[in-house]
């Protein structure tokens, strides 16, 4: 029955002179998310956007599933748009209301409220009069109701605008943030763990177009470990509908670097030296990608190695771009709950090894100094090892909706 999806955006609306740039980006990102669904032109007017719908519930399920993942959106409402004629509005408001009642199958008396907004001042009734007319009409036709203006179970909203009247009962939350691509590009150091996918998601939420970079130590780490990172990339691709759409994953073959570290460096410094290589390569990749930042899933104090000394030793002088650590202020519980919401948690907890866990020394240095780290690195042919690993780099693109199954759709309408 719904013929439009109303889109509300938050922070973009505060952007002053740059507002239209952010609005256009949001429209483009929504178009990109919906590109294979034969949706009509998205309209943008008076601080709102409208996606035309065909009326089929299957289409609405898909559109909701995709659009609520597009960053920049605060809330969305499936709505019925009709001509601004009193009798037509009454009839449709009742239908929309009954439709909502059917979806909640109430046991007891249901409370409701009508909230009408008249933006079109040429319409003959004002908002208060419309609230009364529509409230009375619904009470007359649906048994077992009561009006509650403070905490109604059902809020029927009616917006009388110049181009027609929109009627709806639901406000479904999006993730907020800014449209991807509006703040630049970043390279995300993506492991198979719980944290880095969440860090990448948070960077995407702030409008950064993220490219994943994974270090893989085949045959020490298995193909199944790599598959885990690919599956995470697939999930992230569903939020990544920026200017180019989808998600790009760069895989760096790290085996020879790890072997060299094991052979020549002090055992307690293995992890620090390995991380310093990773940051150096991430910086190189960021330059190649014309990215402006390196994003990591590091936390402060979550594990023994995540000390400020260690962060300094692994990245100082090898990264010349800002490093974003979006998880720095979050507790593990908060990160896990975010990973569940995003849909990466179940993949991240699959029990496959990762190159860091495999090469874990018995007594890793938790507060390494920069000098000590540089001394260890000087035992290796740093540049040559990096160049060799870069030659074996692979790139894979993940399209957001190519393999999505019915079960994976989050909306059921
Ligand atoms: N194999 C890898 N490939 C790419 N980045 C990695 C890899 N291993 C670690 N990193 C980066 O280093 C960060 C810190 O890793 P560490 O193992 O200390 O923490 P973690 O809390 O286990 O992180 P995660 O849960 O993301 O694996 C990761 O969040 C990620 O950004």
Curated annotation (Swiss-Prot):
Reaction(s) catalysed by this chain's protein: [ThiI sulfur-carrier protein]-S-sulfanyl-L-cysteine + a uridine in tRNA + 2 reduced [2Fe-2S]-[ferredoxin] + ATP + H(+) = [ThiI sulfur-carrier protein]-L-cysteine + a 4-thiouridine in tRNA + 2 oxidized [2Fe-2S]-[ferredoxin] + AMP + diphosphate; [ThiS sulfur-carrier protein]-C-terminal Gly-Gly-AMP + S-sulfanyl-L-cysteinyl-[cysteine desulfurase] + AH2 = [ThiS sulfur-carrier protein]-C-terminal-Gly-aminoethanethioate + L-cysteinyl-[cysteine desulfurase] + A + AMP + 2 H(+)
EC no. given is 2.8.1.4
Q: What is one term from the GO cellular component aspect held by the record? A: cytosol
The residues that the entry says bind ATP are 189-190, 214-215, 275, 297, 306
**Pfam hit, one:** THUMP
Main location as per UniProt: cytoplasm
> What top-level class of enzyme does the UniProt entry assign?
transferase
> What family does the database annotate?
Belongs to the ThiI family.
Protein name (record): Probable tRNA sulfurtransferase
Native species of this protein? Answer: Natranaerobius thermophilus (strain ATCC BAA-1301 / DSM 18059 / JW/NM-WN-LF)
């Amino acid at each position: 029955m719904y013929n439009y999806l109303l889109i509300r955006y938050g922070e973009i609306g505060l952007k002053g002179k740059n507002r239209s740039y952010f609005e256009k980006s949001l429209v483009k990102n929504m178009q990109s998310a919906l590109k294979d669904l034969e949706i009509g032109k998205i309209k943008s007017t008076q601080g709102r956007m409208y996606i035309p719908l065909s009326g089929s519930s299957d289409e609405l399920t898909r559109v909701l599933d995709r659009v609520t993942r597009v960053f920049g959106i605060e809330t969305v409402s499936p709505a019925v748009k009709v001509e601004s004629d009193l009798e037509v509005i009454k009839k449709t408001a009742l239908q929309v209301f009954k439709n909502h009642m059917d979806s909640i199958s109430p046991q007891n008396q249901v409370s409701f409220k009508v909230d009408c907004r008249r933006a079109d001042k040429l319409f003959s009734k004002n908002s208060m009069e419309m609230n009364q007319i529509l409230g009375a009409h619904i009470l007359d036709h649906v048994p077992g109701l009561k009006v509650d203006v403070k905490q109604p179970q059902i809020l029927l909203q009616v917006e009388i605008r110049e181009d027609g009247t929109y009627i709806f009962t639901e406000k479904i939350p999006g993730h907020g943030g800014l449209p991807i691509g509006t703040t630049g590009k970043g390279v995300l150091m993506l492991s198979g763990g719980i944290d880095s996918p969440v860090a990448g998601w948070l960077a995407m939420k702030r409008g950064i177009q993220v490219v994943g970079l994974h270090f893989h130590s085949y045959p020490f780490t298995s193909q199944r470990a790599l598959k885990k990172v690919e599956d995470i990339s697939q999930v992230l691709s569903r939020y990544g509908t920026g200017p180019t759409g989808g998600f790009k994953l760069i895989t760096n073959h790290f085996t020879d670097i790890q072997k060299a570290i094991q052979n020549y460096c002090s055992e307690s410094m293995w992890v620090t030296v390995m991380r310093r290589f990773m940051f150096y390569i991430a910086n190189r990749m960021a330059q190649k990608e014309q990215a402006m930042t390196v994003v990591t899933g590091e936390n402060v104090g979550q594990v023994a190695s995540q000390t400020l000394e260690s962060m300094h030793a692994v990245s100082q002088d090898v990264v010349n771009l800002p490093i974003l650590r979006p998880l720095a202020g979050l507790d593990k519980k908060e990160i896990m709950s975010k990973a569940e919401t995003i849909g990466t948690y179940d993949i991240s907890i699959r029990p496959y090894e990762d190159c860091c866990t495999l090469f874990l020394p018995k007594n890793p240095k938790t507060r390494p100094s920069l000098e000590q780290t540089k001394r260890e690195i000087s035992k290796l042919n740093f540049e040559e090892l990096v160049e060799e690993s870069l030659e074996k780099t692979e790139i894979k693109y993940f399209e957001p909706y190519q393999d999505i199954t019915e079960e994976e759709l989050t909306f059921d309408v």
